[in-house]
């Protein structure tokens, strides 16, 4: 007698170790064909062969340029065949854009920039690495806080789940130190209503968009402008606080001196004169207070040698 064994039908399943790969050279996947039934030994033929390191083995490495469906044909020792398919998806190119909420920061501690990176393409599961790390709160964060001491270009390397990488950069400018210089058109004023001083504050450095606040506000036309008019009742030291758009501040001071009240006492060398030509009197005035640099005007001018001098 002869016994003829009928083997189970030949079947095959196909799979990919990673069904989604990236476009970078290091991102590949391993295909696998698992045959059952039929009669050993099996041979394998994968199509298309494009992107495969060897289309005639059970587990080729696949690196297609675009999404591709691979079909494997398995042939057993009897010449029976079975087929299966598997699709390897190719993710779009990994790209990244780096941004900051403030491209120019100040030198004061409260002025910082918040960085951010938006990644797209590749396979999600991104990791981040910012460089240089100096001035960063966390170089591995998607959104670190940056406080560089000088203008710095930060570059972030984004790595996706396939190990593909891309980079993006953003510049954080550091403004010069904020300073303010103050001056007055007159540092010594009198008590009369018309005597006042124009104050001036000139800010530099920092980031423009300055605000001003003078103190004390007493005697100022407007304490919240750069150049108020000052009319203090007594000698006063004014301090201006300048704040830039980053919230950094600088101060400077000046003193407006208020002279004592101006007073004058007039005298005559002879309060009683005669009518003869040789009889005359010399007038004089003693001035105190105010600010020296006095001018004089006597009236009436009748009978005076010069009404515009101190001692006519």
Task: Identify the function of each model-found stretch.
Residues 2-8, 86-92, 170-176, 254-260:
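Interdomain boundary/hinge segments at the C-termini of tandem beta-sandwich modules
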Residues 9-17, 93-101, 177-185, 261-269:
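Proline-enriched interdomain boundary motifs that mark the N-terminal boundary
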Residues 19-27, 103-111, 187-195, 271-279:
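Short, solvent-exposed loop/linker segments at the N-terminal edge
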Residues 24, 77-83, 138, 161-167, ...:
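Short, exposed coil/turn segments at beta-strand boundaries within extracellular/luminal domains
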Residues 27-36, 111-120, 194-204, 278-288:
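A short beta-strand segment in extracellular, disulfide-stabilized domains
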Residues 37-45, 121-129, 205-213, 289-297:
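Solvent-exposed loop segments of extracellular immunoglobulin-like
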Residues 56-69, 140-153, 224-238, 308-312:
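Solvent-exposed segments in extracellular or luminal domains encompassing
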């Amino acid at each position: 007698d002869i016994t003829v064994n009928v083997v189970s039908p030949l079947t095959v399943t196909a799979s990919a170790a990673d069904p989604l790969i990236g476009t970078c050279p290091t991102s590949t996947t391993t295909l696998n064909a698992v045959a059952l039934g039929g009669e050993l030994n099996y041979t394998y033929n994968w199509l298309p062969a494009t992107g495969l390191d060897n289309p005639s083995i059970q587990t080729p490495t696949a690196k297609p340029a675009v999404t591709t469906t691979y079909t494997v044909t398995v042939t057993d020792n009897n010449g029976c065949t079975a087929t299966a398919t598997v699709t390897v998806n190719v993710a779009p190119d990994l790209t990244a854009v780096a941004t900051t909420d403030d491209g120019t920061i100040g030198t004061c501690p409260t002025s910082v920039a918040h960085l951010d990176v938006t990644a797209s393409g590749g396979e999600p599961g991104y990791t981040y690495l910012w460089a240089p790390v100096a001035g960063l709160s966390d170089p591995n964060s998607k959104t670190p806080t940056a406080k560089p001491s000088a203008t710095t270009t930060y570059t972030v390397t984004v790595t996706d789940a396939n190990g593909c990488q891309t980079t993006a950069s953003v510049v954080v400018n550091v403004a010069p130190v904020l300073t303010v210089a103050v001056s007055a058109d007159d540092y010594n004023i009198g008590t009369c209503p018309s005597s006042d001083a124009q104050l001036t504050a000139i800010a530099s450095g920092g980031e423009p968009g300055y605000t001003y606040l003078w103190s004390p506000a007493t005697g100022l036309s407007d304490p919240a402008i750069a150049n108020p008019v000052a009319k203090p009742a007594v000698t006063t030291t004014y301090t201006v606080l300048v704040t830039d758009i980053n919230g950094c501040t600088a101060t400077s001071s000046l003193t407006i001196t208020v002279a004592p009240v101006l007073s004058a006492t007039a005298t005559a060398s002879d309060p009683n004169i005669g009518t003869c030509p040789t009889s005359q009197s010399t007038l004089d005035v003693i001035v105190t207070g105010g600010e020296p640099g006095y001018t004089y005007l006597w009236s009436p001018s009748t009978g005076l040698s010069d009404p515009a001098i101190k001692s006519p």
